[in-house]
Amino acid sequence: MAVRIRLKRFGAKKRPFYRIVVADSRSPRDGRFIDEIGYYNPIAEPAEIKIDVEKAKKWLSVGAQPSDTVKSLFRKEGIINN
C-alpha cells in the first residue's frame, strides 16, 4: 500500500480550504483517508496553515510520500529541510 500525504478539498465553490490527510494513493482525492494531520486555508489573509508536527514526522518516518503542495507547506512550516 503506497501511502501519500495530500490535500483533501472542502469548502464552497471558489472558496476552498483543505485538510492535510494521509491516504492510500489509490483512494480518490476526497475519499477515504487513514489519518488527518492538519489543515490549510489559502483564502485567509495571510494563508492559514496548521499541522500536527508529531503526526507529520511519524508518517514521514514510516515512508509516506508528501504531494508537491504538501511538501512546500512542510518546508514553510520547517518540518522538512530540502
UniProtKB/Swiss-Prot annotation:
GO terms for molecular function: structural constituent of ribosome. GO terms for cellular component: cytoplasm; small ribosomal subunit. Gene3D superfamilies: 3.30.1320.10. Disulfide bonds: none annotated. Pfam families: Ribosomal_S16. This is Small ribosomal subunit protein bS16. Keywords: Ribonucleoprotein, Ribosomal protein. It comes from Caldanaerobacter subterraneus subsp. tengcongensis (strain DSM 15242 / JCM 11007 / NBRC 100824 / MB4). Belongs to the bacterial ribosomal protein bS16 family. InterPro entries: Ribosomal_bS16, Ribosomal_bS16_CS, Ribosomal_bS16_dom_sf. One of its GO terms (biological process) is translation.
